[in-house]
Amino acid sequence: MKKLWLMGLLLASFFTTVAQNNAQTKSNSDEEIDKKVATLISQMTLDEKIAEMTQDAPANERLGIPSMKYGEALHGLWLVLDYYGNTTVYPQAVAAASTWEPELIKKMASQTAREARALGVTHCYSPNLDVYAGDARYGRVEESYGEDPYLVSRMGVAFIEGLQGTGEEQFDENHVIATAKHFVGYPENRRGINGGFSDMSERRLREVYLPPFEAAVKEAGVGSVMPGHQDFNGVPCHMNTWLLKDILRDELGFDGFIVSDNNDVGRLETMHFIAENRTEAAILGLKAGVDMDLVIGKNVELATYHTNILKDTILKNPALMKYIDQATSRILTAKYKLGLFDAKPKKIDTETVETGTDEHREFALELAEKSIIMLKNDNNLLPLDVSKIKSLAVIGPNAHEERPKKGTYKLLGGYSGLPPYYVSVLDGLKKKVGEHVKINYAKGCDIDSFSKEGFPEAISAAKNSDAVVLVVGSSHKTCGEGGDRADLDLYGVQKELVEAIHKTGKPVIVVLINGRPLSINYIAENIPSILETWYGGMRAGDAVANVIFGDVNPGGKLTMSFPRDVGQVPVTYLERPDFIGSGKGQYRFSDKTPLFPFGFGLSYTTFKYGTPKLDNTSIAANGTTTVSVEVTNTGKVTGDEVVQMYVRDDYASVGRYLKMLKGFKRITLKPGETKTVSFKLGFDELNILNQDLKKVVEPGTFTISVGASSKADDLKTVSLTVK
């Protein structure tokens, strides 16, 4: 009897535990959250609901609703109006993507999420999923992962998964909500002007700009989306129901909340001149599905989702209340998913808080090293042999930057927080070889000046050195949001500085620190070694030094084509066939090809590609196969190679791009080592948009190209037949 009683007690305990676990699971389910949100909505006043629809979604003490603090996280955490916390600043987006390793992007975002939580941030306005359109005059090029929709999709999904977490870890105490921006077609701007209108076909929208957002929603479950400043074919994105409802929500299945870009609901009045006042602008935004009004600094005179603007209109038109409830519900749902209702408010001492860790800063170095692209290396000038170098000139406006008294370093690029330190190229080289090599530093000129006053000192430094590291490019003074330009030359007198140093006859390594592809014809023709480093983050100088002296073999590849001249733009590898015959389809007196193509990058070693092979040379339209290629390191040092696969439907019912990237993989090979790299070929890789804009795989032949870059000479091909 006693045994039966004990067994009963154990069973009761077991089922109680199971019930509790099930209840816990259910309490966190979407259905349970919906019930909680509905209860709160029924208790909230109109004023309280409207207050919820602004950035930070402020706390409501009466109902126990927590706030949801925002920040930027493009390449590390930035608090937008504040610079504290000693946050880790990683390489800028264009640099991080140059690694061609999504897992590194994911790790960066995961570390950023931890730093965000440490500062009480739970909602970040990143990543930027804009596909670069090939017009480098546009200042925000640096925020993009590149010119290819597949590449941007892979990097974007990785970033979102890192920032938000996956599975049971999604939105937990170590992760935050990501925001995919700018929906959609933002870089298709006229004259390279930020926020310029986007006139394009629906085909181009779907082929180029929409895929990264589709992947963000369907694969990564992104929690928030931000529309672009611009209009799309005459209808501003912030009131564009076709984009925000029909495509984003109904077609893609997005179920998060939409946050405006800064002041953009208000700009329906002040920029687009559609709304006659802020109230009309607010109603247009609400009806289109914009849930949160971002006005940085919460300037009441710019806000649209504000009691003073909306309340009277809503009370006079009760039918509009459903839009208020809808927006508020989506924001409250996000707070529940983040677990904010159960968390204690975090008290931050801005004077002492330290968010970055040694682990994060070491990873920032690894990411910077893997992002560096070698564009040229005549006669194997690099790597330098420290035993043969007694003196080294370090010259250029971007060679060094002191800690700013206000804001953050200009050489980190846009959307950067303030790290505890920044390692410049000068710092990195001194640290690397300063005990054995005399470093002769001269600035030469300022990045945004036309004065040549510093030239004599720079020329002297070069003449008195065995070799020269010349660091030029751009900074946040000449690039970034609001940094649109009419030409792509090195700004100021930097080109003249390069010419002057070249005339000394000393071996020169040009290090580019920049945020956009530049027109660098003189450098490409006359300087033996060129390193593209973009904005390499807080450890940039260490990474550059490690590459220059051979401790790191550069393995990055371009994600953006370099134009020869501004007259070429837009320049990307995504081209359709040009007119052929009578010399047409070409520029007269100039080369229309890029100076450096998409996917290009050199190494201190060499690689040999075998002939690509298909598991099946013929498949059904709904079938799959695999293409494989052997890659061998034929050099003397270990190196990384990014193997790229491009696909073209040879003859189809609509015009297509000459080829499109559909797979890539970065591999490491020891000298003499061979690896086989394989890529899947199926619907996702072979489909096109037919005349009805539907994704289909059409019967016929497909050219599958595998190789080291998008350039035809770097690719080997095999033909696939689809029946």
From Swiss-Prot:
InterPro entries found in the cross-reference section: BXL, Fn3-like, GH3_Beta-Xylosidase, Glyco_hydro_3_C, Glyco_hydro_3_C_sf, Glyco_hydro_3_N, Glyco_hydro_3_N_sf, Glycoside_hydrolase_SF
Molecular function terms, GO-annotated: alpha-L-arabinofuranosidase activity; xylan 1,4-beta-xylosidase activity
Q: Provide one Gene Ontology biological process annotation.
A: arabinan catabolic process
Signal peptide annotation: 1-19
Factors inducing expression: By ulvan and rhamnose.
Q: Which domain of life is it from?
A: Bacteria
Extract the PANTHER family matched here.
BETA-D-XYLOSIDASE 5-RELATED (PTHR42721:SF3), SUGAR HYDROLASE-RELATED (PTHR42721)
Question: What name goes with this protein?
Answer: Beta-xylosidase
Which organism is this protein's natural source?
Answer: Formosa agariphila (strain DSM 15362 / KCTC 12365 / LMG 23005 / KMM 3901 / M-2Alg 35-1)
